[in-house]
Amino acid sequence: VAGATAVAATLAVGLGAPSLDTAQAAAGRNDVPSAVPAAFTPGVNNGQVRAIAQVGSTMVVGGTFSSVSASGSTAVINRTRVFAFDAGTGAISSFAPNVNGNVETVAAGPTAGTVYIGGSFTSVNGVKAPRIALLSLSNGQAVTTFKPGAGFNGIVQRIRTSGGRLFVGGSFTKYQSFKHVGLATLDPATGNNDPYMNLNMAGRHNDTGSGRVEKTGALDFDISGDGSQMAVIGNFRTVGTEARTQLALVSLGATSATVRTDFKTNDYEPLCYNSAFDTTVRKVMFAPSGSWFVVTATGGGNSSLCDAASRFETNASGQDLHPTWISHAGGDTLYGLAVTDEAVFLGGHQRWMNNQLGNDSPGPGAVPRPGLAAVAADTGLPLSWNPGRNPRGAGAYSLLATDAGIWVGSDTPWIGNHKYKRPRIAFFPYTGGYNLPSTAEPSLTGLRVGGQVSPGSSPVLYRVDAGGATVAANDGGPDWAADQSDPSPVRNSGSNSAGYAPVPNVDSTVPASTPSAIFDSERWDPSGGDEMAWSFPVAAGHSVKVRLYFANRCTCTSAEDSRQFNVAIDGNPVLSNFDIVKSATDQTGTMREFTVTSDGAVDIGFGHITENPLVNGIEIIDPSVPTVAATVTDAVTQTAYDGSTVGATTTVNGGGIDWSNTRGAFVIGGSLFYAKANGLLYRRTVSGTTYGPEVVLNPYHDPLWMNISNGSGGTYNGTDPNLAAQLPSLTGLFFDNSRIYYSTSGDPRLHYRSFNADSGIVYPIESFAPTSLDFSTVTSMTLNGGRLYYVRTDGQLWSVAFSNGAVSGTPSLVDNPAVSGHSWTGRSLFAAPNQ
């Protein structure tokens, strides 16, 4: 999070319509630029590039530098804090004003060949110009008709033209003799005060009385493409008469600007590291449509919007609004920002992105993105584009999107890992880039089953990993079901879960086929409230074996007699004053087995004696059922189905995929995505029965950045997401609206995460979809045409409506194998790819 406060670039294209910082997709251009920077750009020899703008065919750059050089040349050309060059060739122009302070913002002037500059300077070419000036690009001299007079009494951070007005933001309290705290409007031609903007800012974000102190004012603002909305960020707690902390949305009316009373977020209230930062926001920009905007921030930590980019919807209404998505760096500042229709480009000194679970280190799901990143506009997940900047310096302060490509201004000389020398300014052209993949589903002509399963039999009725995630079975039987939901269909509420490192020991009571991982989590019952109770439906009259697994993992009860509790099954005591440590020693897994005859349900109850009862695993076995191993093949079958009529089944080419080890698949945009039991996702192009080569989706370990020093005591290596541990237990997988949905063995919930089809990156944190369907009965599933098709444990194919991320309506039977003879049981169910 360290680094100087900076403001990213402005781009102004004249008066009337607002100047644009966003780039709409030009006809024929790619969605994402090349990761190789153009070679023609000039070099900035020192300092920082703070602002970039395009004025006609000329690029204007502002910052803190004192000299530049032509591309490939070491000859020094003196340029004081601002210079210009040809946008197509990089040729440095004769524009060379002498500015006595930093230039923070640049924007096209009101007439061709003129440019506004703003910053901390007080003179240009030795002539008084308090923090704002309009210059001629031909000679660098001030345009004499623009007369700011006494100008601003504080730093100008942002200049923007819209609707025949010049909007100015910064840390000032007046313009000339007029009171303007943070925001002002001027006549763009004369510099006269325009009373249109009469919203004064007050207060500071860090109002604790200690820590960092910065001036009140606007750090950045942007105006929507239709000129109706302004998003402004900075160090303030009120704008006009409205309480707003660091972010406000302003309605730009015909005669005055007013703070929108229906748009308020409290998510920028957290102080984060206020010893280092007063305000934490850094840059704001609208999408080309004006329907949403993004804010970048510094500040430290992941419990808030600090060190993250956040998307907000312009038409949202409420007094406690939250972002649509948050893209975390995980402890590193994000500065520069450029927004296009397809992507959000981010500059800073970040080491990783997708790092919601990390703080100054790569958490699960983190991917290397040194100093530059592009994230998807709809989810905030990183795209594949990953040129990087190593070393990262303090940051990439200034990003600018044009129809030709993405400009990046920073304080470092290299793009890539010391690969392309582009001192402090680089250009990534759309030529040589790529288009984002389609996510359209195939038209439904048939359903394919990959990894045909001939069911075996198992005496196991239930297995539960108490308090933990799904644990794969070691014996071919059912997996140990996750116990992480509350309420649970087999347990009452009020208990807690805990997790531990792998258990060091298990005793001889534990069957060899039982995975020791079940002892790495527990469910324990605190005192007060109802005692912990479990209930498992079992046909009345059946004699079953109940196995209860225990381990004392908490160091707080490592001594004998420090934890004792009772256990009863169907109301009959089976363990009294049970002491795990006395029975099996500390940090050791043990098992107790009891034979009972069911009365329709097996009820297990726990009772307090000393400390809290706990259980690590529960297994219920019907010894009358023989163990017969299931068989799985790599065969793929296709059954004709158009959404209404089930036709014939044929065996089709499976592309050489090891389908027996898949755990779900889906087809979108001409690609087959599938999960394997090894914890990885894969992709192949597919057309009918023709498959491309297998590509492993492992963006968390980009070979370009593996084991490369990040300059902060570590490397850029990312970390696998926790989804990897779930994939072996998947029972179904499908894609919808930039998300993957999945079910896991023994779990009634429908899980989901955001997913990017370009990069293969998944969101680090999972969520759960509303559903009336019990997904513990699902063995495979796919989505097509708004219908979720799923195979139940009895082999029947059913469907149910699925829209807006939720199951709805009543399920209907599609096909009963007992009648039709079709086989739907397999590792993966997916819609047949179109040719």
Each model region followed by its residue ranges:
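Extracellular glycan/ECM-engagement signal in secreted proteins
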Residues: 776, 787-791, 796-800, 804-835
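Well-ordered beta-strand scaffold positions
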Residues: 127, 469, 572, 670-671, ...
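A recurrent domain-boundary module in secreted/ectodomain proteins
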Residues: 421-441, 604, 609-626, 815-835
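Extracellular protease catalytic domains of secreted zymogens
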Residues: 316-335, 463, 487-498, 767
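Compositionally biased, intrinsically disordered or flexible polar/acidic segments
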Residues: 15, 450-628
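N-terminal export and membrane-targeting signals
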Residues: 1-8
